[in-house]
């Protein structure tokens, strides 16, 4: 029992910097998303329908992570979508979000930052 408790204690101590670093990374990513205007339409977690009965404007990032978790090309494709905007004729989120296309964000966020944000979003769900 003593060995088990010591092992668990060592593992918890070893994991603490990782958790702290992850929390710092999460805070940094949300700050970057706010500065870039992403949080105007998106949220990290799913939101309920609005008071007027309409769905949220854009998909929650957790839902994006779920949708694309097995897609090897998702990072590149979603980074391109962030930079150039979404195609208004393709309704990826029909019925779950508003019918507004995502505008190009190349002026609001650089491609390197967009890629970092997209990669962070894609690992929100293991």
Where do the language-model regions lie?
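Positively charged n-region of N-terminal signal peptides that target proteins for export
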Residues: 1-4
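Bacterial N-terminal signal peptides
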Residues: 6-14
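Sec/Tat signal peptide C-region and signal peptidase I cleavage site
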Residues: 16-22
């Amino acid at each position: 029992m003593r060995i088990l408790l010591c092992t668990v204690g060592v593992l918890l101590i070893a994991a603490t910097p990782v958790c702290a670093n992850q929390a710092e990374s999460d805070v940094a990513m949300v700050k970057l998303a706010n500065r870039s205007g992403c949080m105007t339409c998106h949220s990290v977690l799913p939101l309920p329908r609005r008071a007027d009965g309409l769905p949220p404007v854009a998909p929650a990032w957790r839902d994006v992570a779920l949708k694309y978790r097995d897609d090897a090309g998702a990072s590149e494709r979603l980074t391109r979508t962030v930079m150039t905007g979404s195609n208004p004729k393709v309704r990826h989120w029909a019925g779950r979000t508003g019918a507004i296309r995502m505008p190009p964000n190349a002026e609001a966020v650089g491609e390197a930052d967009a890629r970092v944000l997209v990669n962070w979003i894609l690992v929100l769900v293991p």
